[in-house]
């Protein structure tokens, strides 16, 4: 009887092994019921290598350099098991390494435009999929249009830039812009806004615009324009709505009243149009800078806008510019700050600003400390295409942060407040240049 039992168990084991597709008892990949294709063009950055291997509107089309590395990012709302493939073409003789978390593998090209990477276990949060060319025999490592994820979960829990409607691949690679709108008392004719801005160390990549003092018709802040150039920027939109400054009628053009030494003034376009001024200034992360600007009607149907800037330790304010906006009669409306990235090559790097001591001054000289803000975001943030943003109050300071694919639980349209700091600035407005 014992021999029959042993024979039955051995036969059963053999049949089970033969019943597996490979006949060796090795488990085949899971069958997944949901799949999404993440467009490379809107979700990938070149994180190493020469700029000749740029990402196009169709994804990775020319990958010629061995030291080029690409990173694609997406976010999952929970841990999951998945299968990952790349959609594109790859010569079978080429070797490309893929890294997700701590898992590193070699890609296997298929015959149906699919390059298999295998199965992965992902934790909740942002994922980085890195691709590194190792060896090749032809000019191009691969062409890749999409990253395909197969899962057994609800695909709505995966966040990424989904489409290129209204040029969203471009805006998505720039990253989510976020804003703080300050709560102000009703019934006051607000004239001045004062703010103190500091950028934490290593939070100032190229493409950053740390806007300090925004108003209904323009903005005032500091930029990182290149490795060698930084600017203090002050702009006022024309009342004529257009993206082309050349189309603005003469009676609706922004007029320069005065400007500071070494300040450039001209016109700007693309995101509205109007008058622009900037001072090339080597500001640095880790220091605090002061911004002061005014909005005042001239009683003749125009409004005058003036901006001043200085380091906190300095004694003299620098005049940036004074503009006159025709066909406008308003005091300072909608005071706000924002952080944005204007260069899509650097949307994978985090930037952050702190706003430490914002105040308003009304037309009668009354100072009002700003203690409450509302966090809002641009189209990319509101759609949930990019969720790497934060803002509100931290350590009794207002702050904004975006880019870099960090995990955040910030909620758009949420309110944050801080107690009064009672650090009113000492400014002699009569002595301003």
Region roles according to the model:
Residues 6-7, 18, 415, 430:
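Intrinsic disorder/low-complexity detector
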Residues 1-4:
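Positively charged n-region of N-terminal signal peptides that target proteins for export
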Residues 9-30:
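Bacterial Sec-dependent N-terminal signal peptides
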Residues 23-282, 292-297, 301-433:
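Extracytoplasmic
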């Amino acid at each position: 009887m014992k021999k029959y039992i042993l024979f039955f168990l051995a036969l059963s084991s053999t049949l089970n092994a033969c019943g597996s597709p490979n006949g060796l008892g090795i488990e085949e990949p899971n069958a997944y019921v949901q799949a999404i294709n993440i467009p490379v063009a809107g979700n990938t950055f070149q994180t190493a290598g020469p700029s000749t291997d740029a990402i196009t509107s169709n994804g990775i089309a020319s990958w010629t350099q061995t030291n080029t590395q690409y990173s694609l990012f997406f976010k999952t709302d929970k841990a999951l098991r998945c299968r990952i493939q790349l959609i594109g073409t790859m010569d079978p003789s080429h070797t490309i390494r893929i890294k997700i978390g701590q898992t590193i593998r070699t890609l296997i090209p298929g015959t149906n435009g699919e390059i298999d990477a295998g199965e992965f276990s992902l934790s909740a949060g942002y994922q980085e999929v890195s691709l590194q060319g190792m060896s090749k025999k032809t000019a191009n490592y691969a062409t890749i249009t999409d990253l395909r994820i197969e899962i057994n979960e609800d695909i709505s829990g995966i966040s990424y830039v989904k489409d290129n409607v209204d040029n969203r691949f471009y805006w998505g690679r720039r990253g989510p812009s976020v804003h703080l709108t300050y709560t102000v008392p009703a019934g006051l004719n607000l004239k001045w806004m004062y703010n103190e801005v500091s950028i934490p160390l290593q939070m100032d990549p190229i493409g950053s615009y740390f806007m300090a003092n925004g108003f209904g018709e323009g903005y005032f802040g500091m930029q990182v324009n290149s490795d060698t150039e930084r600017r203090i920027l002050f702009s006022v939109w024309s009342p004529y709505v257009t993206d082309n400054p050349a189309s603005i009628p003469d009676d609706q053009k922004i007029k320069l009243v005065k400007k500071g030494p070494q300040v450039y003034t001209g016109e700007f376009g693309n995101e509205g149009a109007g008058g622009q001024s900037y001072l090339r200034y080597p500001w640095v992360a880790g220091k605090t800078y002061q911004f002061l600007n005014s909005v005042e009607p001239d009683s003749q149907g125009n409004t005058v806008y003036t901006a001043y800037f200085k380091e906190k330790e300095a004694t003299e304010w620098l005049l940036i510019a004074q503009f006159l906006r025709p066909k406008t009669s308003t005091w300072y409306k909608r005071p706000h700050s924002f952080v944005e990235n204007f260069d899509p090559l650097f949307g994978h790097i985090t930037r952050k600003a702190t706003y430490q001591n914002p105040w308003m001054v009304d037309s009668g000289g009354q100072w009002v400390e700003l203690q409450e803000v509302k966090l809002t975001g641009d189209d990319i943030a509101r759609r949930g295409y990019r969720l790497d943003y934060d803002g509100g109050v931290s350590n009794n300071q207002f702050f904004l942060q975006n880019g870099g694919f960090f995990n955040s639980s910030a909620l758009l349209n949420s309110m944050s407040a801080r107690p009064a700091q009672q650090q009113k600035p000492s400014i002699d407005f009569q002595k301003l240049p």
